[in-house]
């Protein structure tokens, strides 16, 4: 087991060194794939088969398809200046551009699609102007866009975790809520507080909040309707978006030329290629079976059981993604820790969530770093301090909950 752990550590270190050296994440993942094949002795034929399957498997097609559709919707919103108008309406309603940087990404974050992060990026970029540097803009966009992912049942990871435990959705959301508040506050404390409030009405200007709300609804209704349909009808985003796009074409009166132009520019091959490479790495790493053996490493150690499972969840998620670790680890943790309940699930899922914010396998990070033209390492520099503070608070919160038998 120690040998396999060392192999995983070597692979992760190579990825970190390459991205910190400002090499493209794509190149780091290709190197990681080759290294995994060599270190774990995966037959070339099996590795080739896994990589080919990764191109056309359901998960890859869903991610790529959703990204293209969301990008198409983004093109409509950009062309009709809906994002700029929504950003201004939010500023007028709240009187604070910092709230725009929080509210818009969190709302859009309920939409479980990687491509939605670019819509958030456009809003944050416009709201912050030159008052945040490009690294800070990237962090704020990615960070607040993903907060909904920590608790919303619109995400597969949450549904998967709830399905394999006896914890109800209501319990989970209730006990995760304080940690969601912590996430919101930490982003403000670290970065957003340096922004001025921004928009203030002039002496002779009267803000009609009813009209501003109507303006906001006119700009955001495609996203709101998509989120409502996904939650209410339990549908995937890729099934809902074509309907939303057709409605948007009608409501915003797009010409045939505009539709064709948007369709052409919505296919961003660079991001699609990066997505496929990430899926290849995930599948090859899963094939090794090394992640499932990580709990053996902490057997008999002095580390408390909950902390051991937390460390494994955190590290395993960074390397292989959230879903695989949820399936592998949560049943083990609930079987091993007496009286495991909502508190343990919140602890493990929160760790999985923050681990995904620094995982090189997280597709959204590849997309948003490409959008703002920064490296993965630059984003990590802004993200890791926030995560360290959050994990400390989270651990204390779990100890408190477990003390009350939750």
Which positions does each model-derived feature cover?
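Hydrophobic transmembrane alpha-helices of multi-pass solute/ion transporters
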Residues: 1-69, 85-89, 223-302
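Alpha-helical transmembrane segments of multipass membrane proteins
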Residues: 14, 40, 74, 112, ...
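Short helix-coil transition sites and intra-membrane helix breaks within transmembrane domains
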Residues: 25, 62, 74-81, 109-120, ...
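Small-residue-rich segments of transmembrane alpha-helices in multi-pass membrane proteins
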Residues: 33-46, 98-103, 205-223, 268-283, ...
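Hydrophobic alpha-helical transmembrane segments of multi-pass integral membrane proteins
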Residues: 66-69, 91-123, 301-340, 345-356
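Juxtamembrane helix-boundary/capping and inter-helix hinge elements in multi-pass membrane proteins
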Residues: 79-82, 92-96, 126-138, 162-170, ...
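C-terminal transmembrane helix pair
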Residues: 138, 143-146, 157, 172-185, ...
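Flexible interhelical linker loops that connect adjacent transmembrane helices
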Residues: 194-220, 256-265
């Amino acid at each position: 087991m120690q040998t396999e752990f060392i192999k995983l550590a070597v692979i992760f270190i190579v990825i970190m060194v390459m991205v910190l050296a400002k090499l493209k994440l794509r190149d780091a993942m290709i190197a990681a794939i080759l290294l995994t094949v060599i270190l774990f002795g995966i037959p070339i034929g099996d590795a080739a088969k896994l990589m080919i399957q990764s191109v056309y498997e359901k998960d890859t097609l869903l991610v790529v398809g959703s990204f293209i559709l969301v990008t198409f919707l983004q093109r409509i919103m950009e062309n009709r200046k809906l994002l700029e108008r929504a950003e201004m309406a939010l500023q007028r309603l709240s009187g604070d551009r910092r709230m725009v940087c929080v509210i818009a990404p969190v709302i859009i974050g309920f939409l479980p699609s990687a491509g939605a992060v670019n819509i958030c990026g456009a809003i944050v970029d416009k709201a912050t102007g030159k008052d945040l540097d490009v690294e800070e803009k990237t962090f704020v966009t990615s960070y607040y866009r993903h907060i909904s992912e920590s608790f919303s049942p619109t995400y597969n990871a949450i549904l998967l975790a709830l399905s394999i435990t006896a914890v109800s959705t209501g319990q989970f959301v209730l006990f995760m809520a304080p940690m969601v508040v912590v996430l919101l506050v930490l982003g403000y404390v670290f970065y957003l507080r340096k922004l001025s409030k921004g928009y203030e009405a002039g002496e002779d200007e009267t803000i009609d909040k009813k009209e501003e709300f109507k303006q906001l609804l006119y700009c955001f209704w495609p996203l709101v309707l998509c989120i409502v349909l996904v939650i209410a009808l339990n549908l995937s985003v890729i099934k809902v978006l074509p309907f939303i796009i057709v409605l948007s074409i009608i409501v915003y009166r797009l010409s045939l030329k505009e539709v064709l132009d948007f369709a052409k520019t919505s296919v961003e091959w660079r991001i699609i290629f990066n997505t496929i490479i990430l899926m290849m790495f995930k599948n090859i790493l899963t094939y090794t079976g090394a992640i499932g053996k990580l709990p053996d490493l902490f057997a008999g150690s002095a580390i408390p059981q909950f902390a051991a499972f937390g460390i494994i969840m955190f590290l395993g998620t960074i390397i292989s993604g959230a879903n695989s670790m949820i399936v592998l680890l949560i049943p083990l943790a609930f079987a091993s820790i007496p009286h495991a309940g909502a508190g343990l699930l919140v602890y493990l899922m929160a760790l999985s969530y923050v681990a995904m914010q620094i995982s090189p396998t997280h597709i959204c990070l590849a997309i948003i770093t490409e959008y703002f033209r920064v490296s993965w390492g630059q984003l990590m520099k802004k993200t890791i301090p926030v995560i360290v503070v959050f994990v400390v608070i989270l651990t204390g919160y779990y100890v408190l909950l477990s003390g009350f038998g939750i």
